[in-house]
UniProtKB/Swiss-Prot annotation:
Physiological role: Monoglutamylase which modifies both tubulin and non-tubulin proteins, adding a single glutamate on the gamma-carboxyl group of specific glutamate residues of target proteins. Involved in the side-chain initiation step of the polyglutamylation reaction but not in the elongation step. Preferentially modifies beta-tail tubulin over the alpha-tubulin. Monoglutamylates nucleosome assembly proteins NAP1L1 and NAP1L4. Monoglutamylates nucleotidyltransferase CGAS, leading to inhibition of CGAS catalytic activity, thereby preventing antiviral defense function.
Species in which this protein is naturally found: Mus musculus
Name of the protein in question: Tubulin monoglutamylase TTLL4
Positions with biased composition (Polar residues): 24-34, 1092-1102, 1131-1153, 1183-1193
SUPFAM superfamilies xrefs: Glutathione synthetase ATP-binding domain-like
Basic and acidic residues bias: start-end ranges: 472-482
Chain's gene name: Ttll4
Amino acid sequence: MASAGTEHYSIGLRRGNSFKQRHPSGTVSASPSEKPSEVKVWSQAHQQVKPIWKLEKKHVGTLSAGLGTSFLGVPSQPAYFLCPSTLCSSGTTAVIAGHSNPCYLQSLPNLFSNTLLYRRTNVRQKPYQQLESFCLRSSPSEKRSFSLPQKGLPVSVTANKATSSTVFPMAQPMATSPTDPYLSLAAAGENPSRKSLASAISGKIASPLSYKPMLNNNSFMRPNSTKVPLSQATDGLKPVSSPKIQPVSWHHSGGTGDCVPQPGDHKVPQNIATVLDDVTAPITPSIPSTLNISTASVTSSQCSQSNFRMEAHPCGLDENPDSQSATKEVHFTEAVRKLAEKGLEKMPRQGYQFEQACFVNPSFQWGLLNRSRRWKPLMGQRFPQEDIGLDSAILPGTSDTLGLDSTVFCTKRISIHLLASHVHGLNPSPACGSAVDPQVLGEDRAPVPPSSLQPLGVAEVATRLSSVHLDQPGKEPEEAKDLNSCTKGGGSATDLQPNQVEPEDTEDELGDGLEDSCSHDENEEEEGDSECSSLSVVSPSESVALISRNCVDLMSKSLPNHEKVVRPALIYSLFPNVTPTIYFGTRDERVEKLPWEQRRLLRWKMSTVTPNIVKQTIGRSHFKISKRNDDWLGCWGHHMKSPGFRSIREHQKLNHFPGSFQIGRKDRLWRNLSRMQSRFGKKEFSFFPQSFILPQDSKLLRKAWESSSRQKWIVKPPASARGIGIQVIHKWSQLPKRRPLLVQRYLHKPYLISGSKFDLRIYVYVTSYDPLRIYLFSDGLVRFASCKYSPSMKSLSNKFMHLTNYSVNKKNTEYQANADETACQGHKWALKALWNYLSQKGINSDAIWEKIKDVVVKTIISSEPYVTNLLKLYVRRPYSCHELFGFDIMLDENLKPWVLEVNISPSLHSNSPLDISIKGQMIRDLLNLAGFVLPNMEDIISSSSSPSSSSGSSTSLPSSPRDKCQMTPEHFTAQKMKKAYYLTQKIPDQDFYASVLDVLTPDDVRVLVEMEDEFSRRGQFERIFPSRISSRYLRFFEQPRYFNILTTQWEQKYHGNKLKGVDLLRNWCYKGFHTGIVSDSAPLWSLPTSLMTTSKGDGTPNSASKSRKKSASEGTTLSSEDRSTPKSKKSQAGLSPISRKTLSSRSNENTSKQSKRSTPGLPVLKYSGQSSRLSAASASQSVTDSRLTAVSS
């Protein structure tokens, strides 16, 4: 990277000028030039001003101390270097302003004849930011020395007829995130005469590989699809070519600060220049209607030994027609690209805002962009500061609550034609007053009320920057009429109650290291076109049109905010006294906000692999990002080692199960399925091609290889994804040696459509392993190979023919995308489109779907013993785990489904309307199905204060809900006896298992309530286990599970009449039975009477169960289904003599306890930090009644 004369240039400050310092009270006092202190101030400042490319923090401290305490209150933001233009008069005033205590410099000396002032602080803000709209942001910054980019154009600020100052953001590209390219853009160029300054913007923007593209439906994501008209101004900007800047070096001239151009290798940075002209001052929160933007550039003719001149020349749209054709694409400089690739450390977030000045810096512009954020007066508001003790007042409309680092881009590489619009100010006077208005800064000025503030929206200003078409300035597209549909619909993550500041400062918009590249655990498989990996295959020439077509078109169809359907923030249970769950909406829905005490609990833990589509969905439900480990509710991230699950609290959910790699790794999957084949026969488990794991099975593979000489084999790394390392071979010599591999028989006769092979991506969601609950999403993806299939051995090396992975075939020039989810075209279809296609061919697609369900259930069951044991060992509560699997299934010529592999992290990358439609709906339904619950605040505190569970203990962790149940010892013992009784029968039959529903325990009711509530939230998911036919799968479990027996029998009994089953459970929940509140009317399960009285073994388990069922049903069926309150004698009709004796002996001492439990008062339901007593006539009850019809469907 070229330097700029670092060793030969110094800066000095001329005496005779003075500072205006702002006191903590907010007033501005002028320091006359005749004051003796003025000499001392300038003398100290002169000693401390150093070359701007070598400045360090220590220089700033001394300079700040010399200039007064006003400098110490400026928070860290992108640094600006201010110096006056040569056009400046003695009245020139420059402003360095941040969030607090701006410094005003009056009567600065000429530009290069004396000074260039640099100011930098190390205070870092942690702004609250909206989650839904972000994609890219720098990680928490670290300090590093300045590096100068190769090219840059200086930014000049000129106040018309009044003031002039110059701002050089020379270090800004390095000091801020690489995601701030918009903020470093401005207009620069030259006219045909080369004597005045041009008015076009040109440059380059790059997207470092560590950043990921994002789908977002705000207008930043629509640079090509939206055409925003210029405002009703008569003059504006013209695009012209960039100026040619002669190389110079700045030579040290005896400490005077004079700049002498010298020939050499050092080049003046071509920074982008922007001049604001005719701006009303001071800048108020009202929307100005005019901003005349012109440009300033540096040319060789303006360089001299004593002065380096800069001139500003406003240029209108009608002045130079030849210049309009010279617009160029904007790209990053090579220096920035190299820095991004090397992964250099990032500077702290820095920046200054201009309060009441003519120049609006990018940080202030970005603050104005946030329409979704409520604009509040921040006068006197305190901000956390790390290194200073001064808290300063902030004027309304000047607070950059979002910061520069939250710039949003949906791009692999974006080319932008940028034009700043020309807007008229509300102030009728065209003149711009002094850059500093003492009346505005005076302490007697009242803050502007929020109602009078009208900041520009994020979409509105962003579109003006990125989407203006010069050739059609007068057209107003329909898309531009509603530019903030995403940001408003998603809600703001920073909306607070009036006059309330959020107490937590430990959250951030992105988790640690979100920008890092995807990593893979040795025991996991990160599959698909991940958000991180997609950058590597994009050519630099891809433009906005491609990005807009691939990932924005569908998002732009989102309804305007006022047309969106308003949804409640919580989904109420079908049952009384059951905690509601959080609702996740679609992009056409607007989710209501919870009260502050509940909304403050909505925290999400971000990961480097959290898909953008998940971020958008949780953002619409007003989640924020937390860096703490104890307050977040959900996380979508990497799989981790099983002992790591100990750290998950009882109120938290992670999108993985421990041990799920048993089917996620290809070698483990084969081991488990081959074990099932040996136990139950190949007829039941013949849906996975025969495989061999090398090097262990090398001898078996050699034997199979020799027996079928014409067989094709496919070689796969056991833990790879996206088609990496896969090859098709037919010779033994082609087999890779000395590394783990899975060698699998190749399905050489696949079912073809239009001559091409294809596979199905099926989305399988497991909410629980014990009891096992499996859901299948009704839609999916059909992925075609981009070359027609040929069985010839000569074509085995053609991956476009034999592999169907999208990440492989998208590199083929013949690959055709499909934007229509209903069309059978291109190389990617919707699964429902395939079923329609096959139905038109006379094929029974329902039969294929049923076969797919069968293989999915069997595959999940093959991993069940491992996962269940690890859950009991390392997970505190079953609630804490859930997982989405991606099954890759291929149909052979007989339409038999074959499982190729299972992905534990299926790709959710959405680069087409088809992906957005299917995956977006699937994620929304999945999160609703997961049942996120707002915890009690005391539960969070207790879990965080409890000793760490990551110790070496190997004992099972407790399950919170069960431990909190307050049951009598009799019911607790009876519950255990019932589970043991149904698990110890060696030859169970259907009648025996059916008796499990005769007497329900509190645990039974709780599990069944969870299952029915979950089913009512299923959306487009279909539950395939338990189901009415799932009893046939019970024999495949390595060990019988009591709750699997219970849920299967429940489905068999009530699948045709769900309302009856739900009504039965509602009756128990009304009494609080599922929470352990047991009244005297509740039946108590006991061993069958025949089993207790038969001591000689003449009774069988089956006969005993039948006799027990006959006796027990008399008391329990009536009490549950008829909703009557049975007598205590009747409730004991089915009990054994021992149980009756036990109950009678303790009846006296339990009378008082039972009377308290049976009081008519309803139990208190606690959730989200508040307590509410439910009643039968509550509002949630009406919601429950309206959803009962959905349960029966």
